[in-house]
Amino acid sequence: MMAAPVMADWRAALPEVRGRIGFDVPLGPVTWFRVGGPAEVMFRPADIEDLSRFLAALAPEVPVLPIGAASNLIVRDGGIAGVVVRLVRGFADIEVQPDGIVAGAAALDATIAEHAAAAGLTGLEFLSGIPGSLGGAVAMNAGAYGAEIRDVLDWAEIVGRDGTVARYAAGDLALTYRHARLPEGGIVVRARLHARPGEAAAIAARMADIRASREATQPVRARTGGSTFRNPEGDKAWRLIDEAGCRGLIHGGAQVSEKHCNFLINLGEATAADIEGLGETVRRRVRERTGVELIWEIRRVGLPCRGAA
C-alpha cells in the first residue's frame, strides 16, 4: 500500500541539490535480481549535507525509499512512486581506526572486511560473506557465519525524513534477528564498527574459508538476492523448503536454486512478479507441508505492473 496521495506537481518543485536527480529511472539494472520498474524520481545525493537539505525541503507527503547495493531487494514491475534515494560514491568512504572502522552506508560489506584485514583488525571477517552495503546491513542487522551487525556496531548516523542528522548508539536501535528499529523514514548514512587487533594469517584464513564456503554452497554467480526467507527459530529455511519439494521449482523465469534452496534465481527473463510469485508458492508449500510460516527476508517494494492480476 502506497503512502498518502502526493500533490500532482511535486516533481516540478524539487529542492536544488549538488547531487543528481533523474526521472523515471529504470531500477532493474541496479538490483541484483535485474528486475523491476522505474523510480518516479531517483536522487543520488553528493554527501550527507546534500541529502539532509533535500529531505528538509522535500514536501513531507512525498514517499522516500533509500536503496544501496540493492542486493536484498525485489522492486516490483510497476516501479516505485515518490523518491528513491540511492547512496553511491559520496557515502562509500572507509576510515580505519586502531580499534574499528567508520564507513559510509554505501561502502560494500566485503570491502569493509578487506580494509579491516589489511589493517590487522579481527572481528569483521563475517562481512566478507554478506552481499550488499553497510547501510542495508545496519538496517536489517545482517549476519552470516556466526556473527551479525549488532555484535560489532558502536553507532549509526541516520538522516531523518525531516532532514535532521543524528547519531544513535547501537542499543538505541533495538537490533534483533534481521531487524533494526530505525526512526520512521530514517536513512542510515554512516556507522562505526568495532574490531580488535588480530593475527594477519588467521584473519586471512578466516576470510578465505568464508569465500570458499559461499562459492561452494550458494549461487554467487547467478542473478539472485541472497537469502530469501528468515530462518525460523531452531530450524533452517532451506531445510524446510527442501522438505516441501521446492528445490529447483520454476515459476515463469524464476527458479528456486538447486545449489541452495533459500535462494531464488532470475534465469534470465524473469519479471519481479515471477520471483515474488515463486517465493509465495514456496511459502504456501512449506506451510502446507510443515505448518511453518516462512517470513520474507528479502524486501519487496513498489507497485505491481499495471494490468497484472
From Swiss-Prot:
Entry keyword Ion transport: no
Domain of life: Bacteria
Major site of localization recorded for this protein: cytoplasm
Cofactors that this protein relies on: FAD
GO CC field: cytosol
Catalytic activity of the protein: UDP-N-acetyl-alpha-D-muramate + NADP(+) = UDP-N-acetyl-3-O-(1-carboxyvinyl)-alpha-D-glucosamine + NADPH + H(+)
Annotated catalytic residues: R178, S227 (proton donor), E297
Gene Ontology biological process: cell division; cell wall organization; peptidoglycan biosynthetic process; regulation of cell shape
Subcellular locations according to the entry: Cytoplasm
Pathway(s) per entry: Cell wall biogenesis; peptidoglycan biosynthesis
UniProt entry keywords in alphabetical sequence: Cell cycle, Cell division, Cell shape, Cell wall biogenesis/degradation, Cytoplasm, FAD, Flavoprotein, NADP, Oxidoreductase, Peptidoglycan synthesis
GO MF annotations in UniProt: FAD binding; UDP-N-acetylmuramate dehydrogenase activity
Domain FAD-binding PCMH-type: from-to ranges: 34-198
Listed InterPro entries: FAD-bd_PCMH, FAD-bd_PCMH-like_sf, FAD-bd_PCMH_sub1, FAD-bd_PCMH_sub2, MurB, MurB_C, MurB_C_sf, Oxid_FAD_bind_N
EC number, as in UniProt: 1.3.1.98
Family: Belongs to the MurB family.
Main function: Cell wall formation.
HAMAP family (alphabetical): MurB (MF_00037)
Name by which UniProt lists this protein: UDP-N-acetylenolpyruvoylglucosamine reductase
Species in which this protein is naturally found: Acidiphilium cryptum (strain JF-5)
Designated gene of the protein: murB
